[in-house]
Amino acid sequence: MEVEQQPSYTSNFIIHLNENEDNGISYRSRKSTPKLVKHYILGEVLGEGAYGKVKDGMDSFTQKRVAVKILKRARLKKIPGGEASVLKEINITKKLHNKHIIKLIDHFIIEEKGKLYIVYEYVGGGTSQNILENAPNGRLPPHQSQFIFRQLIEACEYIHSQKILHRDIKPDNILFTHANVLKLSDFGVAEDSSQLEDFECLSRSYGSPAFQPPELTQFQTTFSPFKIDIWAMGVTLYLMTIGKFPFSGANMFVLFENISKCKIEFPNDLDKDLVNLIKGILQVDHIQRFSLGQIKNHPWCIKYIPEVEPFVPLLEESKFLPLEMAYGDDEGDDGGGGRGGGGDDELIFGYENDGNTIDLQDPEYIPSISVGDQPPSTPILHSSDHHHHHHHNNQHQHQQQQQQLQQSQQFHGNGDNNLLFDSNNNLIFDSNNNLLFNTNNNEHLINGLPVHPIELDPVNIKKSSIGTNISDVALIRENYICSDNDASSGQDDEDYSDDNEISGEDLNPTNHHHHRADRVGSRDKSSRSSKRKNSSSNNNNNNSTSPKVEFNPNRSSPQPPLRNSSNRRPKITFESPHNKSKCIIN
């Protein structure tokens, strides 16, 4: 691949498809270099707060996108109970398992960096606040408001059943997936009522002031803890359907006074059922305030609302993080958690708009190939290297061949006897003299070249010089990751480690095996030229079978480790937006 010596552009590895400049791909200035913390690759900042920030990221083991909250411990220690509050948030979120609750994946501390990392599932559709900002007149269509509010009811029903009070329900903390599934997030001020000896701490105002109920703004001594969340739900509903807050004020004192008076104005043309629902939720007396059961069964929540206006769209989905080769020892702001770098290996980022790919990111979905079934169509590297084999009647050799056949049958799970072996019975060939399996090291091969089982997939996955999308990242990732026994044997390093520069030819499915042929060395050539023997007792069976590759969802296989040849940080490669045959080295 040709390298631009003086690049005038660097690309961000997060893109948004609504910015169409180059075939649906818009390149934007990269704000920060991607970093690796533990086994998470960090991307751009999604949001910032008083105590830290949230970054886009990817789990390099599962190739699943994540959101990483990064908190500086020095700042937390300046706040009374700061670290304890964060640990409480972690413990509360860990116990919640519901489709409408943000999922906590991991959490850890890196002492030398003085930072706490909390890893959540990635929810890319944006927040209710994002939707409101993009909505005409700042409000949502009635049917969309109803759709969102119904899911919010389910989320609150679940957390209240687990004795959890959120205490900060608002549009900013209501997220959406691109499948329009609501996710309630940010349990930073939440409380587990089952762990409280008394409810005095709940009487203090937390969260956003505009969403606080009168019992907290008036510092009342009696209140219903779970009705705090219900009040915030009412304010959120008012904001979604009318486009403004029900209460406002020039300062905090005026705002709290207006909340206590609870004088609410409604447009004249607003749905009467909706007015009745909001009034029932925003009751000053918490005893008279609607319960979740009353809200769920209210006429406005259960009736059909026609779609007069179109839905306000979610944020556009962005493509993300295709390939990673190595763990790097990050020396940047948010790194330091790697296992060791990849030396001169490259950490490659690119993009792919084609979503019609098979999802192989789950390591359990590894195909198996049956004996006698030919592997997927690949270029024949040695089409002229055909040999005619003679059959020998030596009984001892025949027993060895039968034993070898049993081993191959045990591996492949099929009884086809049209197999060929070399003189040492170490290599297994199909009826077309294609090397299928090396019994010395249990290595899958296609035309004599080692491949990972995941590469045996028959679907023609698109590979290009501009990377891939998240669906097929696991497939292409295997081309640059050594096998499970690399670290112990070092055998595959001989084949792969000497080719660190990745070219467009490497990613071309028609040239991929040709490119790797030189790295295989004379070992495979001599193996292919050795005398082969036919162990088949059914030599007259000339029936050919079509390629058949089966997926076994129940089959479990660990994800191969990433290469870690040294502690140096990997190079970062970004593709040129002007010429896809070029790349830019950072």
From Swiss-Prot:
Keywords: ATP-binding, Kinase, Magnesium, Manganese, Metal-binding, Nucleotide-binding, Serine/threonine-protein kinase, Transferase. Residues 396-418, 535-544 have a biased composition (Low complexity). It comes from the Eukaryota. GO terms for molecular function: ATP binding; metal ion binding; protein kinase activator activity; protein kinase activity; protein kinase regulator activity; protein serine kinase activity; protein serine/threonine kinase activity. Its cofactor is Mg(2+); Mn(2+). Its EC number is 2.7.11.1. Residues 553-565 have a biased composition (Polar residues). The keyword Manganese applies. Residues 326-418, 484-586 are annotated as: Disordered. Residues 491-504 have a biased composition (Acidic residues). InterPro entries: Kinase-like_dom_sf, Prot_kinase_dom, Protein_kinase_ATP_BS, Ser/Thr_kinase_AS. GO terms for biological process: negative regulation of gene expression; positive regulation of gene expression; positive regulation of sorocarp spore cell differentiation; protein modification process; stress-activated protein kinase signaling cascade. ATP binds at L46, G47, E48, G49, A50, Y51, G52, K53, V54, K69. The active site is at D168. Residues 518-527 have a biased composition (Basic and acidic residues). The keyword Nucleotide-binding applies. It catalyses: L-seryl-[protein] + ATP = O-phospho-L-seryl-[protein] + ADP + H(+); L-threonyl-[protein] + ATP = O-phospho-L-threonyl-[protein] + ADP + H(+). Residues 385-395 have a biased composition (Basic residues). Residues 40-301 form the Protein kinase domain. Serine/threonine-protein kinase that controls the activity of AMP-activated protein kinase (AMPK) family members, thereby playing a role in various processes such as cell metabolism, cell polarity, apoptosis and DNA damage response. Acts by phosphorylating the T-loop of AMPK family proteins, leading to promote their activity. Belongs to the protein kinase superfamily. CAMK Ser/Thr protein kinase family. LKB1 subfamily. This is Serine/threonine-protein kinase stk11 homolog. It comes from Dictyostelium discoideum.
